[in-house]
C-alpha cells in the first residue's frame, strides 16, 4: 500500500481540488497505483472549518468522499483548527491520536510534535509557519496566534527528540529555514516577504538533531526538490504536484 502527499489545499479557494480528484490521480499514477493508496496527507493549510465556509466544506467533503482513503492533515498556518480546543481526539492505529473533523470522508489533523507509524514508515510530524500577510488578517477570525509553537509544545518536542532521533520521514508545513532560502523565491505583490519565521528556524534546529530519509513540506506554493549533501537527505516541496510513497520509492507527478 502507498501514501499520497499533496501541498496546500486552502479549502479549494484556488481550485486546488482538481489536483487531487480521483480522475486526476488515476490519470497521473494509473488505476493500479491509485487502488494502492491507503492514506492522503495534506502538508498544511488544508483550510477546513473556516468561519462561514460550511457550504464549501460540504462541497469539498463530497468530492473527497469519491475516493476510498482517509485524509490526514499537517497543521499549517491558515488553519481555523489552531483556535479550537474541543476537537475530538481519536485513535486510528497509527501511533499518536489524531484530531478528527469529519466522518465521511474521514478527515483529521495530525498533532504537532507527534510520532506516527503509517504503512511501516516512522514519521515525525511538525507544522505551523509565519503568515506573511497577517497584517491584513483578523485575529481568531482569519489569523491564529498558534501558527507558532508555544513554549510548552517546544519543550515537549525537544524532550521527545532526546529519546527519538531516527525517523523515516519528516512532515511539516514550511521547511527548515536554510532550505527555504535556497529553494524558494515566493513573492506576493503588496506584501513584504519576511524571511524570519520562528517555525522555519525551529524546523532547522530539529533538522540538525535528527536523521531521516526525506523531508516533505508545502507552504511555499511551489514544486521543488533539493538534496542536501551535508545532511544526506532530500527536501520535497509540493503544491501543484503530488507525491506517492510506496515502500521507499517516491514518485512525484
Feature-to-residue mapping (PLM):
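Active-site-proximal loop/helix segment associated with metal-binding centers of metalloenzymes
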Residues: 119-197
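Active-site regions of enzymes building and remodeling cell-envelope glycoconjugates
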Residues: 69-71, 89-94, 105-110, 123, ...
Amino acid at each position: 500500500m502507498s501514501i499520497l502527499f499533496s501541498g496546500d489545499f486552502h479549502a479549494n479557494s484556488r481550485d486546488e481540488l482538481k489536483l487531487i480528484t480521483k480522475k486526476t490521480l488515476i490519470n497521473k499514477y494509473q488505476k493500479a497505483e491509485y487502488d494502492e493508496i491507503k492514506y492522503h496527507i495534506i502538508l498544511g493549510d488544508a483550510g477546513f472549518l473556516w468561519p462561514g465556509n460550511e457550504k464549501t466544506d460540504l462541497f469539498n467533503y463530497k468530492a473527497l468522499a469519491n475516493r476510498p482513503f482517509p485524509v490526514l492533515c499537517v497543521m499549517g498556518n491558515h488553519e481555523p483548527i489552531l483556535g479550537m480546543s474541543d476537537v475530538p481526539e481519536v485513535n486510528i492505529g497509527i501511533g499518536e491520536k489524531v484530531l478528527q473533523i469529519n466522518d465521511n470522508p474521514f478527515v483529521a489533523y495530525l498533532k504537532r510534535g507527534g510520532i506516527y507509524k503509517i504503512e511501516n514508515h516512522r514519521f515525525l510530524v511538525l507544522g505551523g509557519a509565519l503568515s506573511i500577510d497577517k497584517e491584513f488578517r483578523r485575529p481568531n477570525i482569519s489569523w491564529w496566534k498558534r501558527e507558532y509553537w508555544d513554549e510548552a509544545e517546544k519543550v515537549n518536542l525537544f524532550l521527545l527528540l532526546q529519546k527519538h532521533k531516527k525517523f523515516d520521514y519528516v512532515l511539516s508545513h514550511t521547511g527548515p529555514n536554510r532550505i527555504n532560502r535556497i529553494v524558494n523565491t515566493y513573492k506576493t505583490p503588496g506584501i513584504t516577504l519576511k524571511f524570519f519565521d520562528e517555525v522555519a528556524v525551529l524546523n532547522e534546529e530539529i533538522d540538525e538533531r535528527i536523521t531521516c530519509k526525506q523531508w516533505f513540506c508545502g507552504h511555499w506554493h511551489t514544486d521543488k526538490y533539493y538534496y542536501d549533501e551535508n545532511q544526506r537527505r532530500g527536501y520535497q516541496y509540493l503544491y501543484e504536484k503530488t507525491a506517492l510513497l510506496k515502500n521507499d520509492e517516491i514518485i512525484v507527478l
